[in-house]
Amino acid sequence: MARQEQANDVFALTSFLYGGNADYIEELYAKYEDDPNSVDPQWRDFFAKLGDNADDVKKNAEGASWTRKNWPIAANGELISALDGNWAEVEKHVTDKLKGKAAKGEAKGATGAALTSEEITQAARDSVRAIMMIRAYRMRGHLHANLDPLGLSEKPNDYNELEPENYGFTPADYNRKIFIDNVLGLEYATVPEMLDILKRTYCGTIGVEFMHISDPAEKAWIQERIEGPDKKVAFTPEGKKAILSKLIEAEGFEQFIDVKYKGTKRFGLDGGESLIPALEQIVKRGGAMGVKEIIFGMAHRGRLNVLSQVMGKPHRAIFHEFKGGSYAPDDVEGSGDVKYHLGASSDREFDGNKVHLSLTANPSHLEIVNPVVMGKARAKQDLLAGRTRDDMVPLATRAKVLPLLLHGDAAFAGQGVVAECLGLSGLKGHRVAGTLHFIINNQIGFTTNPAFSRSSPYPSDVAKMIEAPIFHVNGDDPEAVVFAAKVATEFRMTFHKPVVIDMFCYRRFGHNEGDEPSFTQPLMYKAIRAHKTTVQLYSDKLIAEGLIKQEEIDQMKAQWRENLETEFDAGQSYKPNKADWLDGAWAGLRTADNADEQRRGKTAVPMKTLKEIGKKLVEVPKDFHVHRTIQRFLDNRAKMMETGEGIDWATAESLAFGSLVAEGSPIRLSGQDVERGTFSQRHTVLYDQETQNRYIPLNNIQKGQAIYEAINSMLSEEAVLGYEYGYSLSDPRALVLWEAQFGDFANGAQVVFDQFISSGERKWLRMSGLVCLLPHGYEGQGPEHSSARLERWLQMCAEDNMQVANVTTPANYFHILRRQMKRDFRKPLIMMTPKSLLRHKRAVSTLNELSGESSFHRLLWDDAQYNKDEGIKLQKDAKIRRVVLCSGKVYYDLYEEREKRGIDDVYLLRVEQLYPFPAKALINELSRFRHAEMVWCQEEPKNMGAWSFIDPYLEWVLAHIDAKHQRVRYAGRPAAASPATGLMSKHLAQLAAFLEDALGN
């Protein structure tokens, strides 16, 4: 018992050291170090006994160099009240103000005399209650807004939370003026005056969610923009007519296509026509606030309407596509895509402000275009800042390019890539100064009701995690929709942060025009059939206002239809005049042809230049404290540069990067942990061990060089890869690389590989030079750390769509990276990259192999053929009994095993580039060994790796050279369900077995 009491005493004496007080104690300690007399004597004694270094104490108090400044935000009265209902601060603030007013004679009681202290207390209580009621409307008003055009959604149980009675006001108080300190733009207001503003602002056809935002400036801006007696949604007569005109265009276009192409899929905008005037407003207001370019990404719903009414794509071109015509000239090859996937670009001008618009081509996989659009926007923003920029481009510069994403309600709530993109929005390497998200919320996903497609009240709720403001709006009130679009655009341009518009509307017909929605939504479609269109409702409103007559509206509709008829006739003979895919940033590039040797590019770098770059790679500023292991790494690299020997993988990569930035090609390397490299091999970003400041040797190669950026990405594959692909679409003169942490994880982004990287050029005439670095190799690390699934990339290869390589030397890696920039066309490159080879004594190159006339080799010879100091000397070609062909790391396993066994009549030939397949080069090499047995050896199981892909090619080559053995024999792991074993003993047994199969008698 005594021991228990003793422990309690110790606890009582030291409880102030509880972790939650740490920040406070550190600040106090720093204060003590500055001036011991500035703290309480007890604290003085406590700190004196610690005897810490004064500088360390101050550093601790300041916190880490990477911490966010002014964060967390100091809790204000309103924030406290939100969390714990403590309104005392607010009451004190109001009481002080009222006392001040009473002293100046500005506040009087009911009799006209100065306020007594009781009256001040009562007035302060009234003020606090009124502010509590106002706050309730800000927090919960959106739940009571009139958002559903069909009126089908159930009203939430509000528990009287918005009723004045809930805050202590009875009808007897309604005529009393209450001090509200300009909270609603009024200093004093009666309860009915407050309710009038609050209901109009928060419970009309717009519902705003913004109280989840922690930045007081952003919250105050929204309040100031929408609250107040003069903040009604108001448009001039011209503005209203312009809205009506765009609605008539949107509705008329859909109806016209419905008549002309009955039953053809168009994924119409019927029921959501307010989108079109809203987009016009975004373009117009954005242009006035400095936007130079808007990049759209959207799904199929309403796409043709956006293309024609917003992007200005000629209607005749769309009608030409409806009758089965191609969107590209006849001389452009490509497999094409359906109408509602195609992109477009145009220039629009409002009030003298030119804005370039582009709509990104996309697949049917919903929301996957989002990161692509963001990546494109980032690249355009970087181009505005210039190739020699540093890595901190001002957000005001970035804001000139606006990514605008249109979503469906079910997809926004359902697709994980949406949350991934929101996660990217604030990151230094991926931010785009705010994306504008517009949800076309037709309250259904194909045939699924919202109750079954999301667990939250709104589809937009996922956006709350990044504190984006959300404007819910009724699509049958076009003025409210346009107003919401205007405020959202202004918020983005002011704060450079994402913002969401959630437009409640409906889908007048089925998911597509051949669909019958009443099977699954009978009540909804009964209501829709009885519901007037948005054009009818808005026309009725303007007629009632006396702004326009029915005859004028009929005339507007007739003129629009006449215009569409003219375009329809022109569409019958329409011919696309040129493909736009090599315009702008792509000017000077061409389509690749199949001629073999022209594809190498001049990739060698003069020896002198390599040495100069190498010197810069190992230099750090004098006062920079390098980690001792990193210093060793730099010293080793300096030695390599001095001798020109032993160039390892990471050094070859840095030399390739250094030479490219020196030549003016920016480099963007992104992925998980790429600064250091998963295997601690890269270290292109160095950290000072004292200050944590960064130093990047590759950005200090020479004056006027292009930028090198290594971006440690968030832990996502899908959104990050989509983003980097988008970046590569906008800037063909930047080398863009994405590295998977292990190649095994690349399939987390499979949609991007399937829908964009492998097929984008054939479907949409869009080239990309993106490089994917996928660590691959069997080293006994188990099924998720061994295989980048080489077979999958090869299965996608056809029509010269991309390159797949599995190189074995640093020199070849150097050349293949430079080759991406040194040709006048662009192709994606899928690279199997090494793990154990990063430090393998044989996997090294010389500087000579990077300079002079050297270049990339698609096939590499047996090292024993040319290196005289190797352990074995090969027989002459005629005496070689077997040729073992292989690709990647397994070459070194075979080489060492052959040396161990003293075999001199087996030749090892490496296929470094698997696609495009080097057939001619292979014919030349294998002609030397016509009588030898041919073996394909791989470390992957038989149903994986390159075997299934390469077997028919090799058979064709053997037939072509009239080889003695017309079939290639397989040596490798047997077929397996899992890519690799997790047991080291089993891994080694499998390795020994297939090496015996490949090299044994």
Curated annotation (Swiss-Prot):
SMART domains: Transket_pyr. One of its GO terms (cellular component) is oxoglutarate dehydrogenase complex. InterPro entries: 2-oxogl_dehyd_N (IPR032106), 2oxoglutarate_DH_E1 (IPR011603), 2oxoglutarate_DH_E1_bac (IPR023784), DH_E1 (IPR001017), KGD_C_sf (IPR042179), ODO-1/KGD_C (IPR031717), THDP-binding (IPR029061), Transketolase-like_Pyr-bd (IPR005475). It catalyses: N(6)-[(R)-lipoyl]-L-lysyl-[protein] + 2-oxoglutarate + H(+) = N(6)-[(R)-S(8)-succinyldihydrolipoyl]-L-lysyl-[protein] + CO2. Its cofactor is thiamine diphosphate. GO terms for biological process: glycolytic process; tricarboxylic acid cycle. One of its GO terms (molecular function) is thiamine pyrophosphate binding. Its EC number is 1.2.4.2. It is an enzyme of class 1 (oxidoreductase). Keywords: Glycolysis, Oxidoreductase, Thiamine pyrophosphate. Disulfide bonds: none annotated. E1 component of the 2-oxoglutarate dehydrogenase (OGDH) complex which catalyzes the decarboxylation of 2-oxoglutarate, the first step in the conversion of 2-oxoglutarate to succinyl-CoA and CO(2). Belongs to the alpha-ketoglutarate dehydrogenase family. HAMAP family: SucA_OdhA. This is 2-oxoglutarate dehydrogenase E1 component. It comes from Brucella anthropi (strain ATCC 49188 / DSM 6882 / CCUG 24695 / JCM 21032 / LMG 3331 / NBRC 15819 / NCTC 12168 / Alc 37). The lineage of its organism: Bacteria, Pseudomonadati, Pseudomonadota, Alphaproteobacteria, Hyphomicrobiales.
